[in-house]
């Protein structure tokens, strides 16, 4: 007898995460070793989706050239940011399900965004609710585009787009920027269609299942870095973030006891009011507030 599963009763109870090679072709021109420009038309991008299986709402996603730990991290970061946009604060999932790609490396990062981490059973696509969702995206959105590549190499050839027709249309394929815009629009429409039901469901989330993600934890695991180390000055830390010199300080007086430390500054590009300062070995962390610099006149 086949086992059946029902969906969670509210959002944020279970997220399912996986990567997918988006079935949209784009053209790319590169220079070969002989200095000649060579254009290829069979390029595709990879998208990692964090899916809330309450109503298949894409709570987070990221697009890149191939699936890798950094792309997964970007998708989880997007999920954290979007949860704040929806709920007013960053929330974690009660349970997060992933595939087994780099599971030893990624487990701790998954644990940041999920109270429980459940790797899916190996070689069983039905174990992951996100797998059928990719087919939904392919048939609902990608199929309508003139650069649609089909259903994958294992599909019946009769269901695939005509290769001669694709070849004739190849010069009209978008470049990488264009296909990224197609993917972003696809995900925007998905969120828009499911937003109302998702928010209504989230209002019923029980307190014991509501897991806030602290600002410090978010910055420590997903924050961007300046690429430089900063030392404490009389006015605090003065890192250059996004090309602008900014002033930060801390109300914790023990911060001043570590004047000899060199600090890495982690920040959220969308909210620079607070940053996290971490020393070289990670043993000390301080949340810093941006200082108001008063004009002289």
Q: PLM ranges: what are they?
A:
Residues 1-46, 57, 74, 82:
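Mobile-element integrase/transposase regions
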Residues 61-87:
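Active-site beta-loop-alpha junctions of metal-dependent nucleic acid enzymes
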Residues 177-297:
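C-terminal, beta-rich DNA-binding module of retroviral/retroelements integrases
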Residues 87, 91-216:
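Globin-like tetrapyrrole-binding proteins
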Residues 1-13, 22, 107-124, 130, ...:
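Intrinsically disordered terminal and processing segments
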Residues 18-23, 51-55, 63-67, 100-102, ...:
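Short, flexible loop/turn elements at secondary-structure junctions
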Residues 56-57, 283:
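Residue-level signal for well-ordered, solvent-exposed loop/turn and beta-edge residues enriched
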Residues 27-29, 108-109, 275-278:
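Short conserved micro-motifs at the rims of enzyme active sites and ligand-binding pockets
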